Design a protein with these regions (language model features):
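Alpha/beta enzyme core
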Residues: 3-7, 14-42, 55-64, 77-207, ...
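Short, ordered loop/turn segments at secondary-structure junctions
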Residues: 12, 47-48, 74-75, 99-100, ...
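A mid-to-C-terminal "edge-of-domain" accessory segment
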Residues: 4-5, 11, 254, 260-429, ...
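Non-catalytic terminal/interface segments that mediate subunit docking, oligomerization
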Residues: 17, 30-31, 376-482, 486-493
Length: 526
């Protein structure tokens, strides 16, 4: 008989830790709604204690979601209380706490003698800290998950000890992360099997796994873990995450479905929503899906070889083990124009996973008409970009109101801008080493800020001569990096928008963190 696998999506927590993938509250809400439509079982919405923005995002998602919402916490009371406060209105809250367990992590993070003079003493300290944190979390929430950080490199004997301790303290899910993506499937499968064999009362909890992709083995390790007793997998849309990323949700789900002949497991995922979810996450994070990415890449269902094309024409199953339609790829292009009407636009946005309020819909419709005047034909990818732009505008401090650029072979590039903030309009002109540099210089002069530009990229996000171009700019100011995205049929305008958005992200970060104190998260809403 087939057994159900719980899908724990951590796109909004671990996935957002991808360099440059910062999401605002409204973007996180849209993604959470789409994840619910995808029918994931658990959404890990963030790390509430880390910042006011994280706290607010977790709270907003928890307030409206029907699925299990998890918040991450270190093995500290302040973290756990912050998660509780963020999730207190959730219909199905989960507190997710963790402790370091590998020798290299223990010696690196708990080197101080107050944790013990020897490795063995430090291990005992961590056992007690883990027990206490889980027991404390249980006073707020029945559903508590414990993660043994860097379990992939943790001695199996100590891993069994800490998992047994977690179960005794009341954990309902025990998570075994391959934090550094170090293990081979044979090793990881053995580890899960040993936990099943050696840990008392392991049958009373859910075994979860969280695999990173540093060696390209995250999905393989997740599958082998399932075959050895894991019943929850933690994963992200498009496999995004720190370093080389996490196990890809779409790859795990489709592997279990396509190979159900040898894997007697299933998920509740609505696979027809996979493609829309992938494109939404890519659009909001600015992380492009590689063309040859399994399941959701642009080339995933493309066949160029003559032999392959001939085989496909005769029988699609010759070279396709799943259909593009099964994962939500619409082969029939739906084209909208300025005569499509508000209802037609709203209907198509809903099909793509976007559900703007009536107030927001008016702004979206006006932006759609403006785009339709420029492009004549508006495709799904245009709508995804449009929604990303409109959701971002909810949090901007400064808006680009006007831009005029002169440039040419015998002309000094000059940019004139007008930036609006509330009722105030700032105008500046600057020259530069090219039109983009001139725009950046004018914005810097207007806002009296000069960050370091770490990276600047431009790409086409739709097709044809009138395609929308997207600029992605990453800036650094002090220790923090901020990413801005801008789109337009004019790449110079897109670049200016992206640079201004990155500065807006920095200014919002500075503003909220100046007002932030750890005590606020403990007492808020109590």
């Amino acid at each position: 008989m087939n057994e159900r696998i719980i899908i724990f999506d951590t796109t909004l927590r671990d996935g957002e830790q991808s360099p440059g993938a910062s999401l605002n509250v409204y973007e996180k809400l849209e993604i959470a709604r789409q994840l619910a439509k995808l029918k994931v079982d658990v959404i890990e919405a963030g790390f509430p204690v880390s910042s006011p923005a994280q706290f607010e995002a977790v709270k907003r998602i928890a307030d409206e979601s029907e699925v299990i919402i998890a918040g991450l916490a270190r093995a500290k009371e302040i973290d756990i209380k912050a998660v509780y406060n963020a999730l207190r209105n959730a219909k199905k809250p989960r507190i997710h706490t963790f402790s370091s367990t590998s020798d290299i992590h223990i010696l690196g993070k708990f080197g101080d003698s107050k944790y013990g003079a020897s490795l063995e003493e430090k291990r005992k300290t961590i056992l007690k800290m883990s027990y206490d944190s889980i027991a404390y979390a249980k006073t707020f929430c029945n559903d508590v998950e414990f993660s043994a950080e860097d379990a992939g490199r943790t001695d199996i004997g100590y891993l069994c000890d800490i998992i047994e301790t977690a179960i005794e303290a009341g954990a309902t899910t025990v998570n075994i992360p391959d934090t550094t993506g170090y293990t081979f499937p044979s090793e990881f499968g053995f580890k899960i099997a040993e936990l099943k064999r050696r840990v008392r009362n392991i049958d009373k909890v859910i075994i979860s796994v969280h695999c990173h992709n540093d060696l390209g083995l995250a999905v393989a390790n997740s599958i082998i873990a399932i075959q050895n007793g894991a019943r929850q997998v933690e994963c992200t849309i498009n496999g995004i995450g720190e370093r080389a990323g996490n196990a890809s949700l779409e790859e795990i789900v489709m592997a279990l479905k396509v190979r159900n002949d040898i894997c007697n497991y299933y998920t509740d995922i609505d696979i027809t929503e996979i493609y829309n979810t992938s494109r939404m996450v890519s659009g909001f994070t600015g992380i492009v899906v590689q063309p040859n990415k399994a399941i959701v890449g642009e080339n995933a269902f493309a066949h160029e070889s003559g032999i392959h094309q001939d085989g496909m024409l005769k029988n699609k199953q010759t070279y396709e083990i799943m259909t593009p339609e099964s994962v939500g790829v619409n082969k029939t292009k739906i084209i909208l124009g300025r005569h499509s009407g508000r209802h037609g636009l709203k209907s198509r946005l809903g099909e793509l996973g976007y559900h703007p309020s009536e107030e927001d819909m008016q702004k979206v419709y006006e932006a759609f008409l403006e785009l339709a005047d420029k492009k004549k034909e508006v495709f799904d990818d245009d709508l995804r970009v449009l929604m990303g732009d409109e959701i971002y505008k909810k949090e901007e401090l400064y808006e680009l109101q006007y831009l005029h650029v002169t440039a040419g072979t015998d002309t000094i590039p000059t940019a004139t801008i007008k930036i609006r903030s509330n009722e105030k309009v700032i105008q500046e002109s600057c020259t530069g080493d090219g039109p983009v540099d001139a725009c950046f210089n004018a914005i810097e002069r207007a806002l009296e800020i000069r960050p370091t530009v770490e990276s600047y990229n431009v790409r086409s996000v739709t097709s044809g001569r009138q395609a929308l171009g997207e600029a992605i700019v990453r800036i650094r100011n002090g220790e923090n990096s901020f990413t801005g995205r801008g789109t337009s049929t004019d790449i110079i305008e897109a670049s200016a928008k992206a640079f201004l958005q990155a500065i807006n992200q920095y200014l919002l970060f500075t503003k909220t963190n100046l007002e932030f104190h750890e005590d606020e998260l403990i007492i808020r809403n109590v």
